[in-house]
Amino acid sequence: MHLALYRKYRSATFDEVISQEHITTTLKNQIKAGTPAHAYLFTGSRGTGKTTCAKLMAKAVNCLSPVDGNPCGECESCKAIAAGCPDIIEMDAASNNGVDDVRALRDEVMYAPTVCRYKVYIIDEVHMLSSQAFNALLKTIEEPPPHVIFILATTEI
């Protein structure tokens, strides 16, 4: 059976991400300083590590004992995220691109995280959202509650 490399191997730390040092250094510095932004936009071709960096960032901002900006992988939060913590929400905008999908997400944003410090919404292929869906999401992205971080990933600008 053929497995894509990104499915077989996904970096566990920012240091393991290949050819994105300028990005991973910036993200690690934000973790070390304790100043994560409320929203990020990751752009690039397929296979450049957008989703990997988004998942690492979700883990790192919630890690209780980060190591040089990397998630430790051993604390309660890291283990919960690895096990599928409900505070890390990944949405494939290619499949969930309607205004009703975004409204459901927007309603969910107001609830505090259950396990982690932050709820992180990773919206992959964000360019696939309909214009109505993106308009419904815009205000929430611009002014999210303090416990929410959005990471948008796209292959198009």
Regions found by a protein language model. Give the residues of each.
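P-loop/Walker A NTP-binding region and its immediately flanking N-terminal helices
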Residues: 1-157
